[in-house]
Amino acid sequence: LIALQDLAERPVWQSPDLQLLMRRPASDLLRYRASSQVQYRYDLSLGKWRQQQLASLPAGSNPRTVAWAQAWWQKTAAQQPQVDKTALAQQFAQYLLSTLHAENYRYTLNPGLYGQHSADEFWFDKKEGFCEHIASSFVIAMRAVGVPARIVTGYQGAEQNTVDGYWAVRNSDAHAWAEIWLQGRGWQRIDPTGAI
């Protein structure tokens, strides 16, 4: 969703990175008008410091995921030396989506508790979770190979009121997905939950 008019007078505001945020929790119905720019490209150029920040992981974080991702990256890069980092990042993202689909990962709202290395548990042990587990595990794998990535939260889906044409978006429509940053293309949305 892109800019709202007269944001200062409304309970919703737009952050510098284009998030729509509420000034306080919603307790009543909220109506606003917004438009969606499906092909909008954001942050086509991202400074080196910001790239490094968005491609880093805490030391010792999810060691199995890091080793698995780096092994795939090194093997594929060696087999395809002519392929640049952007194309390799796209291939790796597709590999992760294919893995989620082909290896019977499961969506559940009751995955139990995850420990300190949640991506390791998701990719190699439990193989189940809800959108936050799936998106964060995807982002951790992408960052493990140096690709700037982030988790995005918002809403997916809504119900249209046939009387007045408005769309009702409920808390049950809350969702998390991922974005990866690619040189010259900016942030690219990827919903790894959709692969399950």
Q: Over which residues does each language-model region extend?
A:
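Acidic low-complexity segments
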Residues: 2-125
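Solvent-exposed loop/turn segments at secondary-structure junctions
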Residues: 39-42, 102-106, 114, 129-130, ...
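Residue-level recognition of alpha-helix initiation/capping sites
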Residues: 91, 132-133
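Short, contiguous acidic/charged loop-to-helix segments that flank catalytic cores in large enzymes
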Residues: 121-130, 165-169
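Hydrophobic/aromatic-rich core segments of domains that either
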Residues: 133-196
